[in-house]
A protein has these predicted regions:
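Long amphipathic alpha-helical coiled-coil/heptad-repeat bundle
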Residues: 2-293
Length: 295
């Protein structure tokens, strides 16, 4: 899971400048008429206006306790009202007024409430984003952008976070299967053997694969070419990886490089073999590029 602060999920700034208050939270004449028409008292008109101006900024309706006092004070003055006690706003929130005001504001701003259609839009946006993105924050940002574009009210961040996490895992599993399903048993057995330190070995086969090739000296050229040949022979036994988007593929390879043999052995089998396939191809590509430059 990721933190809300790593994403574009709208939230209140801790400190607002006077200019920001003026530009974001000043109600226009149409909005003031809207509040006067629906509000029965100063407290109800103020509460309605706070909901209206904050949902315009956030895309969702906050509770009054979460609204910075500077915004409440500014909107109060903008409406030409005297100080309204916070307890009066809380009473409005507890009453039916909150639901009635939210329904009226949604209609006024043409915002769709959170329904099953919202869930469908979230799932679709997450699925499309996860095809090329691996970071949860990036997937969540795509979801937010799409919900705003379609004028949906934003659900709680935790809901977006859970959905993005679940969809990303589903997409990853599909990609992993495209790499592991074609693997013959002989290859997976050799993969497993690479994760165990055999007698006489100083490092595992996996660690040897992870070692990045360096510019070979004249005396090392033969050894280097043998490594390239060995990697090529492996590549012939492995499925291609070009169907996976470059960015996504790069993130998988980055993860594979960070894992040692013990990490891989503890991993779910499907993902383990997929990461090994991807690293084999990445190391071969790097070795071939280096050979063109230095040999």
């Amino acid at each position: 899971m990721t933190s809300i602060h790593e994403t574009a999920y709208p939230r209140f700034k801790p400190d607002l400048t006077q200019r920001e208050l003026d530009e974001i939270y000043t109600p226009n004449e149409t909005e003031q008429r809207f509040a006067r028409r629906l509000g029965r008292s100063n407290a109800s008109r103020l509460y309605l206006m706070i909901l209206l101006k904050t949902v315009q900024r956030l895309g969702y309706f906050p509770m009054v306790a979460d609204v910075p006092p500077s915004i409440v004070s500014f909107v109060t003055k903008a409406l030409g009202l005297k100080l309204v006690p916070l307890c009066a706003l809380v009473e409005e929130e507890k009453s039916r007024s909150r639901r009635d005001f939210i329904d009226a504001i949604r209609a006024h701003l043409k915002i769709h409430p959170i329904t099953k259609d919202t869930d469908k839009a979230i799932e679709l946006a997450a699925t499309q984003a996860a095809q090329t993105k691996q970071e949860l924050a990036d997937i969540i940002n795509v979801i937010i952008e799409e919900l705003i574009r379609q004028r949906y009210e934003l659900p709680a961040f935790s809901r977006l976070n859970r959905t993005a996490f679940r969809i990303r895992n589903q997409v990853n599993e599909l990609y992993y299967h495209t790499l592991t399903d074609p693997l013959p048993a002989a290859v997976t057995s050799q993969f497993d053997a690479m994760l165990t330190l055999s007698a006489g070995q100083l490092v595992t086969g996996w660690q040897q694969i992870k070692q990045d090739p360096k510019k070979p000296t004249n005396t090392e050229v033969r050894q280097y070419l043998e490594r390239v040949k060995w990697l090529k022979s492996w590549a012939c036994e492995l499925p291609q990886v070009d169907h996976i988007p470059v960015v996504k593929r790069g993130q998988y390879v980055y993860e594979a490089r960070a894992l040692d043999a013990a990490d891989l052995k503890a991993m779910q089998q499907n993902k383990r073999y997929a990461l090994m396939v991807l690293l084999f191809h990445a190391q071969l590509s790097k070795a071939l590029d280096l050979s063109l430059i230095h040999i």
